Structure formats: C-alpha cells, structure tokens
Amino acid sequence: MIATSSFVPLRVHSHGSLLYGVASPEALVERALEQGLHSLALTDRDNLYLAVRFYQAALTEGLQPLLGCLITTRDHEALIICVDRRGFANLCELLTARMLNPRFDLASALARTDTATPAAGLHIIVESPGLAASLLQAGIPAARGVREEPHSVRGADGGL
C-alpha cells in the first residue's frame, strides 16, 4: 500500500517493553505500512534495546523511523523523541542515568550543569502539569497534553 497518512503514531511499544508490547519491530513496520503510514516512532518503556532493529526494518521497507523512549519515574512519564544523532546520544545518557539512580528525576537530569545541552536534539512530550512546570522552570520546553487517536493505527482487534 502507498503511504497516504500524515498521522504519525508516537506512543508505540514493541516486545522490548515487557508487559506493554508484544509485536516485533518488523511487525510494527509491516502494520504501519498496511495502514498507509509514512512514518512511525518506536518508544519502548525505559529502553532502546530494539531501536536499531526497528530503524533498519523501517528503512528497508521505505518507512521513516522515529526513535525515542517513554521514560518513566515513580511519579511521571515523558515521551521523548530523538530529532537527530545528538538527541539519540542524549537520550542514551538519560536512560543510563535513569537505570543507575532509583530516585531519577527527569527535570533535574535535563537541567544538570555537567553537560551543556542535555535536552538538545530531543522533543519532550509530557502529560503531567507538574512535570511540565518543572521542565519549564529548568529552561526545558515541553509539549503538554499531546494525544493520539488510539484507533488510528490499531487493527479491529485493538492490536498492531
């Protein structure tokens, strides 16, 4: 099918998100193409384990891949999309900090002073007004309340 939709699903989990996703990166790419999408983001929970596999599968099939992650903390979650290689490197650093620190705080990690621009190359989407305020206070712009239509990419059975 020829890609016709300008809609881009951003909150997509593969089986790399244990208990949250069941599809392989290849199956996600195939389903996106069946739905007429031209682009798809893979945003597994707290990891990038299958990012390269997804990226390669998408490029092979002519789908524009977006890489990102859903970073979760005890109180909040943020959907982070990489804009470029620098963003991917910064997301890797954030995920490392998240894994090493049980009290990880996204706003503090993005505002740290040991790295000049920890949020460079990243789009940060949050639903929590508190997290959005913390990010803005730290000088990090965040999009708030961005929603998808859940039926747009899901099949009749609700899955990809």
Where are these regions (language model features)?
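Phosphodiester-processing cores and adjacent nucleic acid-binding clamps
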Residues: 1-160
